[in-house]
Amino acid sequence: MGSQTLQILRQGVWASVTGGWYYDPDQNTFVNALHLYIWLFLLCFPFTLYMALQPSMVIVGIYCGVIAAMFLLLKTVNYRLHHALDEGEVVEHQTRESKGSRGGTGGANDPVTRREDSNGLGDPGGGIEMADFIRQETPPVDCSSRNSYVGMDLNQRMSSTHGRTTVAKAPGSEETVIFRRERSTFRRQAVRRRHNAGSNPTPPTSLIGSPLRYALHEADRPSGVRSWYRTVKSQPSRTPSQVTVLSTSASLLARNGSTHLEGSQDKASTVGTTSLQDEFGTLTPSLYEIRGCHIGLGNFESATRRASNNIWDTDSHLSSSTSVRFYPHDLISLHHIRANRLLTMDPELLEQQDDLSPDLQDAPLGQDNPSAASAAGKTRQYYRLWLLPFLWVGLHFDRLTLLALFDRNREVLENVLAVVLAVLVAFLGSVLLIHGFFADIWVFQFCLVIASCQYSLLKSVQPDSSSPRHGHNRIIAYSRPVYFCLCCGLIWLLHYGSLRTTSSRFTLYGVALTSSLVLASARDLVIVFTLCFPIIFFVGLLPQVNTFVMYLFEQLDIHVFGGNASTSLLSALYSILRSIVTVALLYCFCYGALKENWEPHHIPVLFSVFCGLLVAVSYHLSRQSSDPSVLMYVPLSKVFPQLRSKNPEDPLSEVQDPLPEKLRASVNERLQSDLIVCVVIAVLYFAIHVSTVFIALQPYLSYVLYGLLGAVGLLTHYLLPQLRKQLPWYCFSHPLLKTKEYYQFEVRDAAHVMWFEKFHVWLLFVEKNVLYPLVILNELSGSARELASPKRLDTEVGALMITVAGLKLLRSSYSSPTYQYITILFTVLFFTLDHRHLSETLLLDLFLMSIIFSKMWELFYKLHFVYTYIAPWQITWGSAFHAFAQPFAVPHSAMLFVQAVVSSIFSTPLNPFLGSAIFITSYVRPVKFWERDYNTKRVDHSNTRLASQLDRNPGSDDNNLNSIFYEHLTRSLQHSLCGDLLLGRWGNFSTGDCFILASDYLNALVHLIEIGNGLVTFQLRGLEFRGTYCQQREVEAITEGVEEDEGCCCCEPGHLPHILSFNAAFGQRWLAWEVVVTKYVLEGYSITDNSAASMLQVFELRRILTTYYVKGIIYYVIASPKLEEWLANDTMKEGLRGCSERNYVDLDATFNPNIDEDYDHRLSGISRDSFCGVYLGWIQYCNSRRTKPLDSEKDSALVLLCFGLCVLGRRALGTAAHQMSSNLESFLYGLHALFKGDFRISSVRDEWIFADMELLRKVVVPGIRMSLKLHQDHFTSPDEYDEPAVLFEAISTHQQNLVIAHEGDPAWRSAVLSNAPSLLALRHVLDEGTNEYKIIMLNRRYLSFRVIKVNKECVRGLWAGQQQELVFLRNRNPERGSIQNAKQALRNMINSSCDQPIGYPIYVSPLTTSYCNSHPQLRHILGGPISFGNIRNFVVSTWHRLRKGCGAGCNSGGNIEDSDAGGLSCGTSQSSQSVQSGLVRHSPARASVVSQSSSYRYSSSRHSSLRTSTTGLEPCRRSSTSQLSLRTLPTSLQLRLGSTSDPAGPSSSLSSHSIPPCKRHTLVGLLGNDGLCSTVTDPLSQHHHPHHHPQQHNPTHATVRRDDISYRVQIVDVGQVLENINLSKRKELQWPDDAMRHKAGRTCWRDWSPLEGMEGHVIHRWVPCSRDPGSRSHIDKTILLVQVEDKIVPIIETGVIELGAEV
């Protein structure tokens, strides 16, 4: 603890004051001395110039020139040295030892130059390369001549290829020199310091060191060239460390799956063994040696695997968060750490260079291995640094020493920027010095500031107090000089402005903005701020530059232009530019209007045009996202459709994600709607404004508008939300306005739209689109003339203020109207009744007060957070420091209030220091808060190597597997969040609000970032399912009810009915969160996990599973369309020939009499006879269900193939279980291996399967997966699957409705995100060293969540505190006090939701935008977007309704059916039978007419009320005989030309003779005699085909009844819908066909739900006690099948009303 404190004081506090300089005891004297001299020079040089010379530009010139030369030299040398270490030639000097003295000519060992190309271990993390691991050969640099030498390239003319040797030996030299060319590819990677991390799915593409790469090249060369390498290898120049690095890199290459090793594994293994000879001639095993420490590779792997499941487990973008990634000093040595750091790199953290702690960088050399030390003494490395083409300098240097000296600038542009900033700092600082802005001691202080800014460009503070991430942050180095230049420039501008004397003075609210006194005071304030830079940067009040720019643009866009929050630096820049361009365009209209002559009772027309455009443009901007990529995606996808094509090499290329297309459609719809609506709005408000209503009706119009606005705002944003809260006004114990789901124990349907929700939507619509525009236009009309007068702001400035203020107020009103009514009412009352003399026109008053009120709300939230956090009666001390800090915080309450005010002005978080009661202000942040675009990447088979999947099972921890549910929850929220917010289901909301969604197992924090008009951009952070103890306590706090609390102080007198007790009401007021709603309905997955061990514990249960496994294989092989091809395959026939013998018995030890049902005890194995005795009946039944049944006798090829496959499948299961199927653990291991597709074909008898791998993929794998589901069903109904028909139907149903896959399979993720109704998986979790197998069952349904609104300042403060504590203060204690539970602030849950590695969420979503037009209920209330397609559909629908109405009006009362069919009624259900079934299926002419007519109707009236049923037949229409046409022909045909199959029915005599002659003449004219005759005479041909027809699965050809399609109905009660009736296994209802059954229910509807008011055709009905089984209802109510669009809805008859027959 003491050493850590000293390190923080040294590297944090002192380095922040000096700009980066501090004494580092872990570095050598040269490094520390050089740092000190540079810093003293930067400090004393300007001070000396100022004191020695007269203040003039000479000082500026000298100072800038020296600084430019110095930085140019240092940056150039630094860059060149890094370049030399990257691509320079390594020069190895081997000294020869002869009895303790150095001498001799050294003729035995000739120096050799090698050139290698290595893309390997160059500089992982910005400064660790292969040479860093043998640093005993490169002692620290000093200034003696021993460390460098100058030589001439004597071999410059010789080719430097791999096969050439180059000799460069000086006469009489005592040393042998080997030049090695190393070129390394540097990755910007860093080792993440954290206490929990995930698994990296994407290891670096190449981590092969130079020796190994060379060895692999050598392995592919001819023997003549290879002999050269043996010569070099045999020399003692190759130290054990180098040999060991070679072998270890070979093992790394093997694990990394690189192409070099895959091509020649035998050669690589030769390199890894025969090449490992040291100078003693011994064969060195695979060792990893660092600084003389030999580490066996096997031990190394075990050590790293104890710390992580995967050697690449450091990517901070992963959901896994439970593994520990620290390497403490007492558990693992420095050498292990460096080896692990080499192998664990994070390719995403581009801002980091080297994360190696200073106390680890130069640890003393261990003397564990004398031989290594002696080898180190004999070999010294140099690097060639070329000065001229033939002149080079040999540098005795290494990477770590160079990085300890100066920060590395990787690009030339970075070096140029650093030099320019250093010179700019010198120029601006010296100019301020010579002009006398500083005097006395402040000159030295200013020189200290200059030195700190310049020194940070050489060696920056790492980590800085405002750094958002661990490790080296490249951007933070530029923060100080950039801020210094900004402040100096601002000082000069203010000073110049204060010296200018001008007659035009602008005053606002009594303040002269152009007064020299005001400008001089502001200049002095900036000067003081600049002098305080050391303290400011130490405290961390200024962020890194990119964060500051994003924050500044966002604040300007929100408070000046009325924009929304930004999602990135690019979006902030885009938003501010968009606002500036808009203001510039509108300014032209406003300026032109103000230049015209204004009459007292007349407004210029141009100003009315300006007002109309202002409202329209504000409406459009409020509906657009700040992210330009969303807007650009639509035109780019049209112009360049190839951009949307997938990469064929992408493993997920086959997975179709519907979300991007939905988003594109939503954005496209919104753009079309805006195009139309903006034109309408502009014209409408222009017409209103030009009518002079805003002048003629004054002042009464203003009073009416303010009164309406106040009443509507109070009702919409205060009364209704309070009445709907869980605890209204913290007095009532339940909501006063309850939803339909409030008392439901389990929600089964989508949330019902209540009347008050519709009322809220319409009030919000009127408020945003009518009241606010009218109020603001009213103020524009009354204030414009006065603002533009010379007494105020004059025309130019007045026009600008009018444009900016109007745009800001209108955009804010459209985007977030929650608190606008309070601002407007307060402003009107304050400036018209209380202080009229202070008013600067109500327009500017509103503009100013809107900014002040936003800051006041922020101050209110901050104070509320502070008070609830430090309240003495509920403070929870997480550590001893908290108890110590609590009393010391009391005397500083006044300072705390000042901090709260200042932090509210600048929108900075107020965070508790180390989680205690002491609060400090953090640096400014945008609304998004987190500076990194962090989002979780799930580990699955698409981003891990195959070897990892088979061996280590990456991503098998619960957190990684459970993250998919939060991803699905994000998708659900994307569809419904914006609409639910507008319906008021989450209460009041504003930008930056935070909510917690809590259910049984899902706990997610939802951060609302950007809120626009009809759009919300949010981020979801999912917490662990089974969190820590502290998380569980806080989850209990937000889920427990307080209604039953009866306490009052210290007694329990009870409470009034429906009223909270005193203690409960008091406690709820002292929380930083509140429960908004307890039953928020959202579609998700209910998760059921059963222990596989308990379900397979007994041999009998394993026997059942194996039986289902075999039957599943048989089902899939017979159902496969490739069965005949397999039976004819010669390779398979040859492989199965042995099995075809009569006396063949498979005696494999895998088979077990306790598990295999067909085990033959007499033969001690499985024979064909025993197999057929059990499974032949099942084979024959499956074969009978084929379209073309095959021979399935006992000796047939089909049975032989089934036998071979079943034996192979069980043998694969035994192989995966290591031949120990009797052992439960081994059986589960094998079952899981087969479930994920890991089949190991180990027997020669099974190699025939390789003839077609589709047998494994399409037969055996589905068989093992389906057996798991059938095994689960066995527990609910043990004997149900004994019948082959039931089992066959069950497998078919599961195959259609159930997704069974491994959770690592990309298909699993695709199914979840595609809203598959049910999923099943077998999960293997390694939890604390124990293997646990779970059967996971997911069922999609509606979930109930509690919505908790958290004080957003509480969330921002706790997040900022965690970031500072872990990054700057380096507190890595996993049980630190700041994450202990605090129920009043939900401290643990909020801190757990931070970005990894600061927090440990299992899922962090990308920034996701939800649009209101994707919410079906909101579309039903307000109507969809006014797009061109919707307008066309509306016109077509209206036209068809008019035609229907006109047809009904012109009807003479007669009825086609009544007159032509002997009074046959459309309503007869019992008597009439299916009169057109054969007609539909087997009449060619009839079928053609039906298809043409139905397709015509469907295309023409798809969106109209005249829906076409799925039968393809038009419902019967009541129309006059004169209206018979092609459009109504199919109905007439089906009603009159059919014949019944039931002779007992009253309609059995129906024939063509019932058609009148006039109608028959019409039909003949339309169809011809052949068509009509075939239609009439071919009704019974359906009986000629008794076998199953594939057409029966097509609803178009389904058999429907005449009475089932005779009328339309409207749904009036969705509670009568039977959405799960098609899933019943007991077959209560006889459906018309199976395809119709699959389409009639929630499993087919997916995101669609029937709503009240929907209309459709009745296509089938079940009546109680019907004679016909196909029409018999299993309950005492009539059930209808209603066709609504393309969906089929089963509903009880009482839930609809009949609309009558269609006309």
Curated annotation (Swiss-Prot):
Source organism of this protein record: Takifugu rubripes (Japanese pufferfish)
Source lineage: Eukaryota, Metazoa, Chordata, Craniata, Vertebrata
Protein name: Pecanex-like protein 1
Keywords: Glycoprotein, Membrane, Transmembrane, Transmembrane helix
Transmembrane segments: 31-53, 57-74, 416-438, 477-499, 525-547, 569-591, 603-622, 675-697, 704-721
Listed GO CC annotations: membrane
Feature: compositional bias, Basic and acidic residues: 91-100
Entry-linked PANTHER family: PECANEX (PTHR12372), PECANEX-LIKE PROTEIN 1 (PTHR12372:SF2)
Protein encoded by which gene: pcnx1
Glycosylation site list: 256, 564, 988, 1129, 1391, 1622
Localization per Swiss-Prot or TrEMBL: Membrane
Sequence segments annotated as region (Disordered): 91-126, 1475-1556, 1577-1598
